[in-house]
Amino acid sequence: MAKRSWMAKGLSASRPMTGEMGHEPLLVAFDFDGTLTVKDSFNAFLKWRAGPRWSFGVLRLTPALIAYVFDRNRGKLKAAAVRQFLKGATVAQIENDARAFAEAFAPSLLRPDAVAVWRGWRAKGAKMVIVTASPDLIVAPFARGLGADLLIGTRLRCSDDGRILGGLDGNNCRAKEKVIRLREVFGPDVRLTAAYGDTSGDTEMLAIADEKGYRIFRGKPA
């Protein structure tokens, strides 16, 4: 129960934390999926939200999955998944669903050892940033629960009246795009005190960190 209460703090907020911040002496960036969590949160969210429609939706994604085998373009595959499972939903609906998902699954998704390191940096007064390839709308409730100062994630294309159009607004936030997005906020000479990741998509972010943590978290939720 304590884990659920801790995760629920701040989940009533309605917007991802994507505003500008001033540079601080201690700046720490964490990847989300596989680093702070034990598995991909976006796939888990889509499956949970789709319910019995999940299998049919995946079947309809077959052409995109086959294309990925050849081009290895994660952004194209993610855009196809957004079109299949989220297109037409309102941003408000997705935000509400993301909050419900975080409240239900944070205790079974978050790595306890990663959260402990996160809290350790926070106790030192570091500015804490999550930089993720998952959509910012989906990760925002987790980021708020963790007390993140900033969330940088993949943005979804939305209409002026607040509906998901399908596809991505800009590039998939992985690899060099993570550094590009960090520089947009903190300037071209940004340097991270520490960074943590678990895939090749985090290499560029780790390269601008003084302390690099690659696949160092192995903890499983109780």
Curated annotation (Swiss-Prot):
This is Protein CicA. The gene is cicA. PANTHER family: PHOSPHOSERINE PHOSPHATASE. Pfam families: HAD. InterPro entries: HAD-like_SerB, HAD-like_sf, HAD_hydro_SerB1, HAD_sf. It comes from the Bacteria. Coiled coil: none annotated.
